[in-house]
A protein has these predicted regions:
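Sequence-structural signature of mature extracellular/luminal beta-sheet repeat domains
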Residues: 1-105
Length: 105
């Protein structure tokens, strides 16, 4: 059985958060010669219904509220990928440069 799905945008990165400066080394390696304002992945929801996303090339962690409001939750010198909230409440991420890290602050 085949299902036809239609993808529609659920959220859109606000213009203020689009990186317009020099591409990171990761962006240059992944998309040589092309602009890259973000590369969002690692989406998951916390217990309060917030959506968390990592922006790999620019070391940013975004939180999107259930109402669709974006905030920059963390900015690190790294390339964060997968993230989760640990059972004890700590925010844990896998980072290409630093390995397994805890996001604090």
């Amino acid at each position: 059985m085949t299902y036809k799905l239609t993808a529609v945008p659920a959220f859109r990165l606000p213009e203020d958060y689009r990186h317009m400066g020099e591409p990171s080394a990761w962006a240059k390696m992944t998309r040589p010669g092309q602009p890259m304002h973000s590369f969002l992945e690692a989406a998951f929801f916390d217990a309060d219904g917030n959506l968390w996303l990592s922006d790999v090339p620019y070391g940013r962690i975004f939180k999107v509220s259930p109402e669709g409001d974006w905030s920059l939750a963390h900015q690190i010198d790294g390339e964060p990928h997968a993230m989760r909230i640990a059972p004890d409440g700590r925010h844990i991420a896998v980072d290409y440069r630093h390995g397994l890290i805890e996001l604090v602050g």
